Curated annotation (Swiss-Prot):
Binding site for ATP: 626
Amino-acid positions noted as binding L-isoleucyl-5'-AMP in the UniProt annotation, renumbered to this chain: 582
Subcellular location: Cytoplasm
Domain characteristics, as noted in the entry: IleRS has two distinct active sites: one for aminoacylation and one for editing. The misactivated valine is translocated from the active site to the editing site, which sterically excludes the correctly activated isoleucine. The single editing site contains two valyl binding pockets, one specific for each substrate (Val-AMP or Val-tRNA(Ile)).
GO cellular component term, pick one: cytoplasm
Classification of source organism: Bacteria, Bacillati, Cyanobacteriota, Cyanophyceae, Synechococcales
Motif ('HIGH' region): 68-78
Keywords: Aminoacyl-tRNA synthetase, ATP-binding, Cytoplasm, Ligase, Metal-binding, Nucleotide-binding, Protein biosynthesis, Zinc
Predominant location: cytoplasm
Native source species: Prochlorococcus marinus (strain MIT 9301)
Cofactor binding, per record: Binds 1 zinc ion per subunit.
Record-given protein name: Isoleucine--tRNA ligase
Cofactor: Zn(2+)
Broad EC category: ligase
The UniProt record lists the keyword ATP-binding: yes
Length: 968
């Protein structure tokens, strides 16, 4: 009856107003769409952004920006690239380096030129001269740059946005002419007739970096028989020695060289066929008494393909076949067998290669050796010209192949036609096939400085290391670099040609003069001014003899000159740059073009370190494309989509967190599920920071600061853990291992703080007297944690970090988190013995919590404070740790009971009966019992001794004293 009566008299009075509850303006919800731009304005108005790094007193750190193309909307590839760079720059700024990040844009080239033309009506296109085209291209590029720039800034990227480098700027074009000029004067640039990758769809030559190689291209491959007209006496003697009696007339009328090609349209350009001198070839006769020449190792495959049974008449080394003559397949002339190289194999075909020196690099090289004609049968549109004879007017990408195949068939020269799937070069812009076509072009002779370039590669640190092997093999095997383009929107090659003849005018005086003119007036004057005004004064009298060249430079030469136009010219930067950071495709692009120009001019690489990242894919590992509907838009990640339920606004920091979470050295996935997971992590970090800020609202570090040995053991451990985490995160940033930062941050916020230190701290913070040491010491530690947590996350979660800093409730010397500098702690804060003991005790805490949670799940108890724990130790190290805690711990903070958040804990030698739960494990025996005594209505601890409180409430002795001294 008494117990029931006491329940009926239970008071509804709450001691909430007597507790030290959270107070902070740092909201639980980030509201990033509004708050992040406010923070960015704060940075801009207070010179916190890139100006901060520029004003540092340390060593210059230069991360040179590879220029994105000034066309189109920003995508996830941009986000991955620019955020990685920004993380590094912000970290270096905090470390005291002088960081001046100059963003850049690649502005010339065909895509912009085509965009301009597409936006014009037909009549406007016809009447458009070069200068107007260039003006429209300039205007278009600036619009694209401004759009992209605003996007980058919204991502929190710091940079010299008011003075970026643009490849269309006068100063840049002038510096680029300087690079070209020095390479020319060093003997590395020449003009010559040579097969180059030619895009009929773009009507210009292409560099290797402008090509794509899809795996699913099908070519019309053909096997062709070429009638032998003359055979050397040595081979005739071989037949005689083998007792093969074949009359000369019969042999010449019935013997054929067998070739295979995947480009039938080049047949009219044939000038020879090539064999490998090391391969064994056979003359084989079929049942129709026709003799064929092909590689011995391919006999079985050819027999199947032709559906013929062959009898081998004679085996001959390739080196012995030279000068066998045959009748050209479409022209009235004889050609011959020549000796080729290792490019001729027996992997496919016949082992004998159709050779058209005007339409292939290997063919060209063999042609040079044998002084063969360099016949080009195709014009700039891809149409066959007069040199193709009867096929003139047909197009290589349309009907030429079919016409030539039909011709060969009618003339009994076609042995077999079949589709052949292989990798084939496509124009990366138009997505259409390219061809090899011999034209007069300007080249950079890589042979002249290849060994220096390879040595420079060895001097650079490549991350990952595989990047070094990749670019090394590319430079070892690359041919001369075709740097001329037949387009209007680019930097002109500053050469003059004799009106009558092939003589060129290009020397040091002219190069320097053009460079000065471009510096003052820009490259447009090349089309605007006449020759007389472009030439130096002492050439004025002969200006009528010369005409301006029409070629522009490859855009890779544009961007590849950025070390000279940016790093070398700007005093706040340095050359070589500390770091280049781009996608892995740039080993054949910007990394390589920059390396080649820098080595050719200055005999050194333009960078000290090169870091590469993969590509952004969807969650299923597929390439993003509009057709698949799997494109992830960074703008939608930040601002949300039309349907905020399916596409919520996550803000820039979640985008940045994604970049830090992935192993960017390989291709990385992104999608809605990943974003939700990242948002959860972001929220946990934010809520951890909010809890820290909310509990130091009445803390003043000027009054309540402590030496570490004055603190309870738990607080000493927390500060030591802060030092360890800082060291780990520092190493992650230093080594560009940002995914480690992500993992360390998660573990620190969730495992060390939320689940352990802050969980235990609740009683100290809420229930203690405001100025009690157990509370102030905890606030001291929390202030250290929140200040340094803000700094540690600031390179990645820059907006949240600044938001935390602005909500620190006491005054700080620094206006911004980025002015604080990178944390430096005394290593004495780390205590190995303390760490070992607390690690043991945390392990025990985990096991006890499991047992308590089991009781809670069975609804035996509600809160853990309703229990008390008996522990029978079996682990010596753990027993020692409990003894250590009891001996050296602070009695107001370091009782293991309080670390468990139970009402009582005791080490026992025997367990009692009638427990709520018992658990036996390697650590010992754990027994969960119902807490004895009465519940304090203020702190909820169960105590055997309680006192009457307000309105029939019960208080423990501690809470009773606090209420009496502070509130009554």
């Amino acid at each position: 009856m008494k117990s029931q009566n006491s329940k009926e008299q239970k008071s509804d009075f709450s001691y909430k107003e007597t507790l030290n509850l959270l107070k902070t303006d740092f909201s639980m919800r980030a509201n990033s769409v509004l708050r992040e731009p406010e923070i960015q304005n704060f940075w801009a108005n207070n010179d916190i952004d890139f100006q901060l790094g520029s004003s540092n007193s340390g060593e210059i750190f230069t991360l040179h920006d590879g220029p994105p193309y000034a066309n189109g909307a920003l995508h996830m590839g941009h986000a991955l690239n620019k955020v990685l760079k920004d993380i590094i720059n912000k970290y270096k700024t905090l470390k005291g380096f002088r960081v001046h990040f100059v963003p850049g844009w690649d502005c010339h080239g065909l895509p912009i030129e085509l965009k301009v033309l597409q936006n014009l009506k037909s009549d406007e296109r016809k009447n458009l001269d070069t200068l107007n085209l260039r003006k429209k291209a300039t205007d278009y590029a600036h619009i694209q740059i401004n759009n992209q720039k605003e996007g980058f800034k919204r991502w929190g990227i710091w940079g010299d946005w008011n003075n970026p480098y643009l490849t269309l700027k006068k100063s840049y074009e002038s510096a680029q002419i300087g690079v070209f000029g020095k390479m020319f004067l060093n003997g590395y640039i020449y003009r010559g007739l040579k097969p180059v990758h030619w895009s009929p769809s773009s009507r210009t030559a292409l560099a290797e970096a402008e090509l794509e190689y899809p795996d699913d291209h099908y070519s019309k491959s053909i096997y062709v028989s070429l009638k032998i007209t003359k055979i050397p006496e040595e081979i005739q003697l071989n037949f005689i020695q083998k007792n093969i009696n074949i009359k000369k007339d019969f042999f010449q009328n019935n013997s054929f060289i067998t070739i295979w090609t995947t480009t039938p349209w080049t047949i009219p350009a044939n000038e020879a066929v090539a064999v490998n001198p090391k391969i064994n070839y056979i003359f084989a006769i079929d049942e129709e008494k026709r003799i064929y020449l092909f590689a011995k190792d391919l006999c079985s495959e050819i027999s199947k393909k032709f559906n013929k049974d062959f009898k081998v008449l004679l085996e001959v080394k390739g080196s012995k076949l030279e000068n066998i003559e045959y009748q050209h397949p479409s022209k009235n002339k004889n050609c011959r067998i020549v000796i080729g190289g290792d490019y001729i194999t027996t992997e496919s075909g016949t082992g004998i290669v159709h050779t058209a020196p005007g339409h292939g690099i290997d063919d060209f090289n063999v042609g040079q050796k044998y002084d063969l004609p360099i016949t080009c049968v195709v014009d700039e549109k891809g149409n066959l010209n007069e040199y193709s004879g009867q096929f003139k007017g047909s197009n290589v990408l349309k009907d030429a192949n079919d016409l030539i195949i039909e011709y060969l068939k009618v003339n009994n020269l076609l042995l077999l036609q079949e589709n052949y799937k292989h990798r084939y070069p496509y124009d990366w812009r138009t997505k259409k096939p390219t061809i090899f076509r011999a034209t007069e072009q300007w080249f950079a002779s890589v042979n002249g400085f290849r060994s220096s370039a390879l040595k420079a590669i060895e001097d650079v640190e490549w991350m990952p290391e595989t990047g070094k092997k990749r670019i090394y093999s590319m430079v070892v095997g690359r041919g001369d670099w075709c740097i001329s383009r037949q387009r209007s929107w680019g930097v002109p090659i500053p050469v003059f040609y004799k009106k009558n003849g092939n003589e060129i005018l290009l020397n040091k005086e002219i190069i320097n003069h053009i460079q000065e003119l471009f510096s003052e007036h820009g490259a447009d004057i090349w089309w605007d001014w006449d020759v007389k005004n472009l030439l130096p004064e002492n050439y004025a009298k002969e200006s009528d003899l010369w005409k301006k060249g029409k070629d522009t430079m490859d855009v890779w030469f544009d961007s590849g000159s950025s070390w000279a136009a940016v790093c070398e010219l700007r005093s706040e930067l340095k050359y070589p740059a500390d770091l280049y950071l781009e996608g892995s495709d740039q080993h054949r692009g910007w990394f390589q073009s920059s390396l080649l120009t820098s080595v050719a001019v200055n005999n050194k690489p333009p960078y000290k370190k090169v870091l590469t990242h993969g590509f952004a894919l969807d969650e299923n590992g597929r390439k993003m494309s509009k057709s698949l509907g799997n494109v992830v838009d960074p703008n939608i990640i930040i601002n949300g989509g039309n349907n905020k339920k399916t596409d919520p606004a996550y803000g820039a920091d979640v985008l940045r967190l994604w970049v830090s979470s992935v192993d960017y050295s390989v291709d990385v996935p992104i999608g809605s599920n990943i974003l939700k997971q990242l948002s959860d992590v972001y929220r946990k970090v934010r809520n951890t920071a909010r809890y820290l800020l909310g509990n130091i609202h009445d803390y003043d570090p000027k009054i309540d600061s402590f030496e570490i040995d004055q603190l309870p053991l738990l607080d000493q451990w927390m500060l030591g853990r802060l030092v360890e985490v800082t060291d780990q995160i520092s190493n992650a940033y230093e080594n560009y291992e940002f995914s480690k930062f992500f993992q360390i941050l998660q573990s620190f916020c969730v495992v060390d703080l939320s689940n352990f230190y802050l969980d235990i701290a609740k009683d100290r913070l809420y229930v203690s007297s405001k100025s009690q040491f157990r509370r102030r010491s905890c606030q001291f530690v929390m202030s250290k944690v929140v200040e340094n947590l803000a700094v540690l996350i600031s390179p990645v979660l820059c907006h949240m970090a600044e938001d935390i800093w602005q909500n620190i409730p006491y005054s700080t010397k620094e206006k911004s988190v980025f002015q604080r500098g990178w944390p430096i702690f005394s290593q004495s804060w780390k205590n190995k013995i303390l760490n070992e003991h607390i690690s043991n005790l945390r392990n025990l805490r985990v096991e006890i919590n499991k047992a308590i949670e089991g009781c809670r799940n069975k609804q035996i108890i509600g809160a853990a404070l309703e229990t008390e724990v008996n522990y029978l130790p079996e682990d010596k190290a753990l027993k020692d740790s409990l003894t250590w805690l009891k001996e050296f711990g602070n009695q107001d903070v370091d009782l293991f009971r309080d670390w468990l958040i139970v009402s009582n804990f005791q080490v026992v030698s025997d367990l009692v009966d009638n427990s709520l739960a018992t658990d036996n494990n390697a650590l010992g025996k754990i027994q969960i019992n119902k807490a004895q005594g009465q519940k304090c209505d203020r702190c909820w601890h169960y105590q055997k001794e309680t006192f009457n409180g307000i309105q029939n409430t019960k208080l423990c002795k501690r809470c009773s004293n606090i209420i009496n001294f502070e509130f009554i």
